[in-house]
Regions:
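Conserved PLP-binding catalytic core of the aspartate aminotransferase-like
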Residues: 324-328, 335-350
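Conserved PLP-anchoring active-site segment centered on the Schiff-base-forming lysine
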Residues: 140-159
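Amphipathic alpha-helix from the class-I
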Residues: 302-321, 332-336
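Active-site PLP attachment segment
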Residues: 243, 249-285
Length: 350
């Protein structure tokens, strides 16, 4: 008997009520607990996110030693000694939180330093920090885009980008994943109706498949039709490009005109938070109109300070190159054993 649970974000209840879906889910989970699949969150880690971890299996009530292959801490930065020590020092000096929103009392010297550092490695003018990469994507799209605009997404764009689109009220269409011809067709067909009003959105590195967006071609077509390009660098920063500088660096793209980048500090950087980095004019505008930033408490100074230390390690060592070598080694071994790892170009293995 199958006990597969519907874990999509589009549940409806049998009776159409608000709480009905909650009760339906409870019934499904009661059946699911009887199976051995047990995909629901049940196994907390008892140790730091390292190569080897100890987890507690609540189903068996046993501690389990495991090798970590499921983390998104690509560089192992969650346990960098330099970052840990800096976080401790800054916590003692500044406390455990920022104490305010960015436009009032929440901006620390470490936040400003981190914003400048991200802009520098990304080749942009300035940066805004957010509480997560998710809220950064919500903020940039809902802040810039209005219902009279059009957003064109890659079919496999991250959920946060789609949610930001819904919040903006703009029309959305999607091109076939990685299909440059389909993207150009949509731009050609729609640009007369939306002069200077189209945003093209893509992940830099796609989080599920591990492939890299064809940015040179996407950028050429986007500029041909006077559109703006938004690239989500969540799985690219610290992973690809020179010293982990991301997708634009990976392709050697130096002209940043009409490009906006978003990203996260919670993956390769190993802390928590997100960012938008772009031209000065765009950043100045979004500091006021990105509501997910303006109405959220700023990141703790200790988090910003730790992220700075991680980026310094990225920029001064060969750790990103070592990540690439390790990923290629594992992928080659898996392929030699007959595993299909699809078309991944990064450490992500589908």
């Amino acid at each position: 008997m199958s006990y597969i649970v519907n874990l999509t974000g589009n549940r409806t209840s049998k009776d159409g009520s608000i709480m009905g879906k909650v009760h339906d889910f409870k019934e499904e989970m009661a059946l699911h607990e009887q199976s051995e699949l047990n995909v629901y969150r049940k196994h907390p880690q008892l140790t730091a996110c390292d190569r080897r971890v100890t987890v507690y299996n609540r189903h068996t009530q046993q501690k389990v030693q495991a090798i970590m292959f499921g983390s998104n801490s690509y560089l192992g930065a969650t346990i960098f000694p330099e970052a840990i020590q800096k976080a401790i020092e800054v916590t003692k000096e500044f406390g455990i939180g920022s104490g305010g929103v960015p436009l009032l009392t929440g901006t620390s010297i470490y936040q400003e330093e981190l914003e400048k550092l991200i802009a520098k490695i990304s080749g942009m003018d300035d940066t805004i920090l957010f509480s997560s990469g998710y809220t950064a994507n919500l903020g940039v799209i809902s802040g810039l885009i209005r219902p009279n605009n059009l957003i064109i997404h890659d079919k496999l764009d991250h959920a946060s980008l789609l949610d930001g689109t819904v919040m903006s009220g703009a029309k959305m269409i999607r091109y076939k994943h990685g299909d440059i011809n389909d993207l150009e067709r949509l731009l050609k067909d729609n640009s007369p109706q939306y002069p200077n009003g189209i945003l093209v959105v893509t992940d830099g590195v796609f989080s599920m498949d591990g492939d890299i967006a064809k940015l040179p071609q996407i950028l050429e077509i986007t500029r041909k039709y006077d559109a703006i390009l938004l690239v989500d660098e969540a799985h690219a920063i610290g992973v690809i490009g020179d010293k982990g500088a991301g997708t634009l660096s990976h392709y050697g793209i130096t002209d940043r005109k009409n490009i906006i980048l978003t990203g996260t500090l919670s993956k390769a950087i190993g802390t928590v938070g997100g960012y938008i980095t772009a031209s000065q004019d765009v950043i100045d505008y979004l500091r006021i109109y990105a509501r997910s930033n303006m109405f959220s408490t700023s990141l703790p100074p200790s988090v910003c300070a730790a992220a700075i230390e991680v980026i310094k390690v990225m920029q001064s060592t060969e750790i990103v190159e070592h990540l690439k070598q390790n990923a290629e080694y594992l992928q080659n071994k898996l392929k030699s054993e007959g595993f299909n790892i699809m078309n991944t170009e990064t450490p992500i293995i589908p």
